Every structure is written in structure tokens, then in C-alpha cells.
Amino acid sequence: MNPEHPMASASSAMPRRTFLKGALSAGASAFFFPRLLAGDPSGGRINLACCGIGNRGGEVVMEFAKTGLVNFVAFCDTDMGAPHTLGVLGKFPDVPRFRDFREMFDTLGKRIDAVTVGTPDFSHFPIAMLAMSQGKHVYCEKPMGQSFRQIALMMEAERKYKVAAQMGNQGHSGANYFQFKAFTEAGIIRKVSRIDAFMNKPRRWHGMKVDGYLPEQPVPPSLDWPDWLSTAQEHSYNKGYMNGEWRSWYDFGNGALGDWGAHIFDTAHEFLRLGLPGEVEAVKLEGWSPYIFPQASTLAFRFPARGGMPPLTLNWYDGLNNFPPLPDGFGGEVVDPNIPPPSAGGKDALKRPTGKVIYGEGLTFKGGSHGSALQIIPSAMAREMESRLPKVPESPSNHVVNFLRACRGEEKCRSSFAVAGPLCQTMSLGVIAQRLNTKFRFDPSTGRITDNAKADALLSGVPPRKGWEQFYAL
């Protein structure tokens, strides 16, 4: 295939399945030897391929462009040329284009050092797995994968192929990361028994009422619908699944929890060493549907005691008016101008609260999302504690620079798959509780749901479509 400026297309004569042989051979060498960057072994720019270049994927492209540390060697999007991809294509008109990531690797794999994955949640897994199996570093938007099993395989691949793999919850390189770490190490945050996390902004499915999947519509000429479906089960095309609308559907997305949980309780999960819960409960679901996410959800994740830390209950609240009880002295929500706007809801969404309350021994904290720093509440207690707080270091790098430096062996990924994986698996368990409107026990030692066979079966997700099974064996 010739990846000239007119897009390399899925209709090319090059066989797309030849990637397996290359994946296995590249993976074997990556396992035993440190891999030099293809672009410049002396330490120059990193050759970057970007999968998903519209909407959030396009924002990721621009974040990497700002670093000045990358060469874009390939763009891949199943809807290449659609309006939401034109911004990136206009800025970088000479970068080779593909609709199919498998053809991209077949054609340009030797030139690629690292890959971004900014596609819908359900399609993260095959792209990331193929990239890692070929020794490519991976920056993957959150959540890592859609099912518990997918996430486990992605963590295993990170270890097996010895690559830098970062999940794109960018606040994990912000002020809250370094503050939470310093506060826990100094004993300021200690013996936490409860966290209330809330995301009460409008979501795309709010107000939706469906009694099945959407009716078939003509596929736009720019879109490769079978490749967009990726590992998902067969569905007829409908524009109601596109451009972020997929987030509404269990078959494609992970709801408000999967979209925002990694921005709200990520640091608590890491530094309180939460791991995986022993019990998950759908406490309240408003407007439950077997197809789309509830209009409002209250979920409880109950974590066992951990090495001197007490049992902890993480309560999750989403929905426009589904707020947690707030402690005295809470005041207003934490507002951080660096937090990106929500993808739906317009200006009103900016006014809706998002954040957390952390109940520790002797102190209570409130925080927002992404990198927003915690505040001790009430304010009188904050003033009393001010002189006793440890110094919090500045971040040496933002999230994408941290990843790029990790590709070069200069830093470690702050949200590596090893760190982000159990967080994403916890959220995937919450989605199972939502989908079945149930409560279940989970055994972290075996990775199985012990008292609900239907829920346990969902740990693996739905079987992949024919022709997509191989990504589970890489």
C-alpha cells in the first residue's frame, strides 16, 4: 500500500491480517531487549501515530503537537475526512492517513515509536494491544478498556512487552497528584473510611427513552462502519451512535462513571491503595434501561482493609440532582479553570458540581476533578492546619510530556496501565452493577464475582465479532 496524502483505504490489496506475524516477532524482541526509538536513537523526536483524530482524539493530537517532542507519522480514523477530523487534517495535511489501524501498522509499523488511542471506549483495546505487541508505546484515553478482562490483558501486555503505557486522565500529572501523595506520606490524609464522589453534569443520555437499538440509516461515505464497530457486536449504523453519542449505550461506552471516575477519585484510588472492591452495589438507579445508562445512579464500592488502612466505602453519585450529603462547612464546589469543559450540556454544565469529599481520621477534605487540589474543610480547620502541611512539589511535566519522557526512559508514567488498570477495573464492576441493577460480591484474589453468575459472565464483556478474536491472544 502507498500511504500517500490521499488516504490509504481499507479497499487496498494489501492483506490486513499479516499484522499477526509481525506483531509476534516484534513483541518477542521487545520482551528481551530495550527497544530504541525508530525515529532517532540518539534521543530526538518520537515518531507518533494517532488513532482517532476527531473530537477528543483531535484534542489529544494537539496536546502532543504543543510539546514539540513528536513527529506525526500517521493518522488513523474510521471516519477520516468527516467534519470533526478536518481541524487536525488542515493543520497537518502531509501526514499519511488511514481508516484501518491494522493497515497502518502493516504499512508504517517500522517507523512508529508510539501510538495515541483517542477512539470510542470500546475500541481502545484492539488498537492498544496490537501496538504493545509490536513494541510500541501507548497513550490511551480513559478508561483503558471496556471490560474487566480487556483491562487485565492490557496490564499484562504492558508488562510482557516492556513498553511505556499511559492512560490519559491528564489530572494525574497535576497538582492533586503531588498533593495527595505528599499528604498521605505525611499522615495528613490518614485512615480514610469513606469517599463520596459526584458528577452531576448533564450527560447525553439524560432525557433519552429507548426500547431497543436505533434503526438502520445509510452509512456516510466517509465512514468505515465495520471498522468503527471494532470488537463490538454487530449493529446497524445510526448517527445516534456517533460523535460521542456512543457514551450513552452499554454496548459502546462506560457511562458517567467510566468517563469521569478516573478524573475524580484516581489519586485516592492510587495513594490509598484501594485495589479492587469486595462488594459493589447499585444503591439507586433512576430510569434504568437495559440499553442505555440510568438517568441517575448511586453506587457503593466497598473495599477491604489494606495494610493498616481501614475498610473504605466509595460512594458514586451521577445524575442532575443526585447529590451526596455534604458535610458542614463544605461551602461551594471546587472550581479549577484548568478543568476542560464537559462534552455535553453547554454552559449550564459548567455550573453543575463535580468532585469528591474524603472523610479521614480527624480531617475532611473536598476536591474537584482532574488536577484540582484538595481543600481541608471547614475553613477554620484549614487555617489551623496550614502551618503543619507538608510542602508539595511542582509537577516536572504535564501528562503527555511525562509519557513522552517515559518513552525515552527519562520518567515513569504516572498513570501507567499497572496503576490505572485496577482503577478502570473497579469502574467496570460499577458498570456491571448498573447494567444488571444489582449488588454482588467480588473476590479480588480470584478476579471473580462469587454470588451472581450473570454478573460474573459480564467480566469478560461480550464476545468479539468474528475476525476480531485475535486481539485477545496477543
Give residue ranges: language-model regions.
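N-terminal secretory signal peptides and thylakoid transit peptides that target proteins
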Residues: 5-27
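N-terminal Rossmann-like dinucleotide-binding module
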Residues: 22-92, 171-174, 268
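Beta-loop-alpha module in the N-terminal Rossmann-like domain of NAD(P)-dependent dehydrogenases
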Residues: 54, 79, 95-153
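Short, solvent-exposed loop/turn and secondary-structure capping segments
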Residues: 59-64, 84-88, 125-130, 150-151, ...
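Conserved acidic residues
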Residues: 73, 113, 193
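Short, solvent-exposed turn/loop segments enriched in Gly/Ser/Thr/Pro and often Arg
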Residues: 79-82, 98, 118-123, 144-146, ...
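A contiguous active-site-proximal alpha/beta segment in oxidoreductase catalytic domains
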Residues: 137-139, 145-227
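Contiguous beta-strand/loop segments that form the cofactor/metal-binding neighborhood of enzyme cores
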Residues: 179, 191, 196-202, 206-418, ...
